[in-house]
Amino acid sequence: GMLPMVALVGVGNGIITPFLYFPALRLFKSMHYMAESDTVDSDHSGLSLRQSEEGVISVEHLTYTYPFAKEPALKDVSLAVRKGDFVIVTGPNGAGKTTLLMSMAGAIPHYYGGTMEGMVFTDGKAVTQHNIADLASSIGVILSDYKAQIVTLTVGEEMAFTLENHGFPPEEIRRRSKEALAKVHLEGLENRKVTTLSGGQCQRLVVAAVLAEEPDVLVFDEPTSALDPEGIREFYEMVGELNEKEGLTVIVAEHHLEAALPYAKKFVLMNHGEIIVSGTPEEVMRRMYTEHIYEEAIPDMYKAQLELEQVGMTFEKPFLNLADAETSVIHSFAKGGEKDA
């Protein structure tokens, strides 16, 4: 099954700062959290692997099983993410969302072990042919337990930490840090102690530290689970801005769909390790409703539209926000709510 949280924390630090990982790896193995065997090592170094789908990330017929697990966590999963996409991956707990995201960053198979069939390409790089440090220049990962990714005392030190380890000179570190902090609205806080930041600010700091490495893709694993409704709204405003203004490709594993709706271009619904459907938010939520898959995650407003349609009403616009819902209802009643002929 999944690794215990202590292991995930270590793996998370490994993704952002790979050299931290290796002492943790020995610890996990000695405590039997990670497998010594039941792992297929494929040396693809001599092969020329090319992705078959267009896209900044191409997941191709990926089947993956954690060490010693009886069932695959992912079963023949294929997904193409294009540059500039804003993708929400949703589904019940245990659907495979986190596993899919970790495969994009190369944490699967490099750090989790296990067996993998199929391939994942990130920025054209086959994840089995590149280590996580190579992939980190293309893809930035923010874990659900984002505080575990903070390893220093002040905001400025946190921003400099990974960049220093990449060997960037001080003036380049200052430039990148300043620009990244401004993008997440934390400018001027370099001297602040990390312990004085709110939960939302800590999360923004982790995002800024990842942005300073200038990746093309940002991956968030359930980023809003510890935030209040206002924090969730602010988070999506920030990430929506990074997608729109900076052109970053964004992939989020998420349960709270309502706040994501104004920004998401694509939804992906997972269940039991498979992708059930991917498409526009509206297409995917309709399938969730008609097939009774993770219905509880459908925003109340959109569910109200689907239920009104069941009794014969038609609407000009989907209820993706309150303004559209009000307009559509008023127009529908003005027409008498008749079904189109």
Regions found by a protein language model. Name each.
Residues 1-38:
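Membrane-embedded alpha-helical hairpins and interfacial helices in multi-pass inner-membrane proteins
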Residues 90-92:
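The feature captures the beta-strand-to-loop junction immediately N-terminal to the Walker
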Residues 171-189:
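Conserved ABC ATPase "signature" region
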Residues 193-197, 201:
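Conserved ABC ATPase signature
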Residues 218-221:
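Catalytic Walker B motif of ABC-type/P-loop ATPase nucleotide-binding domains
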Residues 254-255:
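H-loop/switch region of ABC-family ATPase nucleotide-binding domains
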